[in-house]
Amino acid sequence: MRGGSVFGRCVVVGGAGAVGRMFSHWLVRSGVAVTWLDVAGAGAADGVRVVAGDVRRPGPEAVAALAAADVVVLAVPEPVAWEAVEVLAGVMRPGAVLADTLSVKSRIAGRLREAAPGLQAVGLNPMFAPSLGLQGRPVAAVVVTDGPGVRALVELVAGWGARVVEMPARRHDELTAAQQAATHAAVLAFGLGLGELSVDVGALRDSAPPPHLAMLALLARIAGGTPEVYFDIQAANPGAPAARQALGRGLVRLGQAVERGDEETFAALFAELRGVLGEHGAELERLCARMFTALH
């Protein structure tokens, strides 16, 4: 480590993926010597060394890179990360930093504490698609095993311009069940509903009011993404089933109020929703107005 806040050597496992490339880009800009350990073994970014291999079964070159690293970033799916932890615990030097980028933190945090107690460990979850850019966007940070290396890495990410939000693993998963699992489920269900209604999207687009246009845009973005990423968010988060069930119950309550012709109950739902938003309602309403101004 150089200067106590800048790492000398880093291995990004799964560097060829979008998240791995984003971290690699910023690490290289910070003067860090970055090595990718990736099964693809090709398509490296500028300034990055590539070692082809599987982190679960690393060859001699991969072992040497991992052993020399100040920090290892696991930008891989959860099943791979789960197996890799024990391997890395036996290869990385004591006190080095292991950072995962998984979208669910409770399980991997427990795994790290159990299988890699000698490593400093932190979970980093960029709460945005890497293509949007990091500047000003939130990165959730779950400190598993604290130490100077973890502090240096968190400070480094903040120095890149990210808005780092630290929280415990359980809290992270509770929040992302609402932020990601419920949100994605609502948008996907909206799209499935459009398909069932057999409506022409072009006609919808031509006369769409801002809320509908925003939903169409969200649907297009998610549907154009990688299914495995969205499946992992729905399947791995322990709070996702409850989030989907809550959405379903909300639709039932809405439908019941309308079908019964009960305007008082319908109005009460609006009052309930204003209570959910609380003191943040006015600010979020202004944000929505700015978003809608840009939609046309």
From Swiss-Prot:
One of its GO terms (biological process) is tyrosine biosynthetic process. Pfam families: PDH_C, PDH_N. The keyword Oxidoreductase applies. Its EC number is 1.3.1.121. It is an enzyme of class 1 (oxidoreductase). It comes from the Bacteria. Residues 9-288 form the Prephenate/arogenate dehydrogenase domain. Pathway: Antibiotic biosynthesis. Gene3D superfamilies: 6-phosphogluconate dehydrogenase C-terminal like domain (1.10.3660.10), NAD(P)-binding Rossmann-like Domain (3.40.50.720). InterPro entries: 6-PGluconate_DH-like_C_sf, NAD(P)-bd_dom_sf, PDH_C, PDH_N, Preph/Arog_dehydrog, Prephen_DH. It catalyses: 4-amino-4-deoxyprephenate + NAD(+) = 3-(4-aminophenyl)pyruvate + CO2 + NADH + H(+). The keyword Oxidoreductase applies. Belongs to the prephenate/arogenate dehydrogenase family. Involved in pristinamycin I biosynthesis. Probably catalyzes the formation of 3-(4-aminophenyl)pyruvate from 4-amino-4-deoxyprephenate. PANTHER family: PREPHENATE DEHYDROGENASE, PREPHENATE DEHYDROGENASE [NADP(+)]. This is 4-amino-4-deoxyprephenate dehydrogenase. It comes from Streptomyces pristinaespiralis. The lineage of its organism: Bacteria, Bacillati, Actinomycetota, Actinomycetes, Kitasatosporales.
